[in-house]
């Protein structure tokens, strides 16, 4: 492990992580491919849709916990498929029961099936309820800086604005809003949704995001395991570029070689 990796950790809810890439576990052809892709990504936090993935709800069926053991990964149960605050809160409480008191959750409350944009009113309501109920909430939201700050003030441990619609692969559509959110946040900011390829992930990190969560960008690739590896490298490169500080943009050229002191 490099000195940079040792000193530059992602901290969420009081726990440190080396990897700034968080990955989903859906859309793979089988659990073996899921395991291989997660391992290639280097991710330490994996998110799971409680309403769609078996983590003990259905005894006798393949269980994600068998291929991605919770003593090796931090599970992040999410409320994918919920369209009301009530459903989201109920799903988080079910996850807490299934995972023996686990309180770190990813909250998402969707507005409609076409865009899968977050319903911000329902999201705010669910976040308030869950925080009061002792949950550590990582929240999926729009790229509205005011809303992001409000969710932070409610007590969410991380705010996760979308780059583009879920599963669209369009990349970051509004860099300036993401930058505004990052610059005013006191909690980790992770881009969630819309990443399509490695360069999208690198850009998010170059903007100063603390991490990126993705699923479809890896699972829907022609070679998911190879794409997972590419995303790992992109996250690391983007983070190092952010820490290094990019050169200022200039309108005109600037010669790389000095004019003074030439031989002729």
From Swiss-Prot:
Keywords: Cytoplasm, Schiff base, Thiamine biosynthesis, Transferase. GO terms for cellular component: cytoplasm. Its main location: cytoplasm. GO terms for biological process: thiamine diphosphate biosynthetic process. Pathway: Cofactor biosynthesis; thiamine diphosphate biosynthesis. The keyword Transferase applies. It catalyses: [ThiS sulfur-carrier protein]-C-terminal-Gly-aminoethanethioate + 2-iminoacetate + 1-deoxy-D-xylulose 5-phosphate = [ThiS sulfur-carrier protein]-C-terminal Gly-Gly + 2-[(2R,5Z)-2-carboxy-4-methylthiazol-5(2H)-ylidene]ethyl phosphate + 2 H2O + H(+). Pfam families: ThiG. Its EC number is 2.8.1.10. It is an enzyme of class 2 (transferase). It is found in: Cytoplasm. GO terms for molecular function: thiazole synthase activity. The active site is at residue 106. 1-deoxy-D-xylulose 5-phosphate binds at residues 167, 193-194, 215-216. Catalyzes the rearrangement of 1-deoxy-D-xylulose 5-phosphate (DXP) to produce the thiazole phosphate moiety of thiamine. Sulfur is provided by the thiocarboxylate moiety of the carrier protein ThiS. In vitro, sulfur can be provided by H(2)S. HAMAP family: ThiG (MF_00443). Homotetramer. Forms heterodimers with either ThiH or ThiS. Belongs to the ThiG family. This is Thiazole synthase. It comes from Thioalkalivibrio sulfidiphilus (strain HL-EbGR7).
């Amino acid at each position: 492990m490099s000195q940079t990796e040792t000193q530059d950790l992602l901290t969420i809810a009081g726990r440190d992580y080396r990897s700034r890439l968080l990955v989903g576990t859906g859309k793979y052809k089988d659990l073996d491919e899921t395991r291989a892709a997660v391992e290639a990504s280097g991710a330490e936090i994996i998110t799971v849709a409680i309403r769609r993935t078996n983590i003990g709800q259905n005894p006798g069926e393949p269980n994600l916990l068998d291929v991605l053991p919770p003593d090796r990964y931090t599970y992040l149960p999410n409320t994918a498929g919920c369209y009301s605050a009530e459903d989201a809160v109920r799903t988080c409480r079910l996850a807490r029961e299934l995972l023996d008191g686990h309180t770190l959750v990813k909250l998402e409350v969707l507005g409609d099936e076409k865009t899968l944009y977050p319903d911000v009113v329902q999201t705010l309501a669910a976040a308030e309820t869950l925080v009061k109920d002792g949950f550590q909430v990582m929240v999926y939201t729009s790229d509205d800086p005011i809303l992001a700050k409000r969710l932070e003030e409610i007590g969410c441990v991380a705010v996760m604005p979308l780059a583009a619609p879920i599963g669209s692969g369009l990349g970051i559509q509004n860099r300036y809003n993401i930058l505004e959110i990052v610059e005013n946040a006191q909690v980790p900011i992770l881009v969630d949704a819309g990443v399509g390829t490695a360069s999208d992930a690198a850009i998010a990190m170059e903007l100063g995001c603390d991490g990126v969560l993705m699923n479809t960008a890896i699972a829907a690739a022609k070679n998911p395991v190879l794409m997972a590896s590419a995303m790992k490298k992109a996250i690391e490169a983007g983070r190092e570029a952010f820490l290094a500080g990019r050169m200022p943009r200039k309108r005109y050229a600037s010669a790389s070689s000095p004019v003074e002191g030439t031989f002729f």
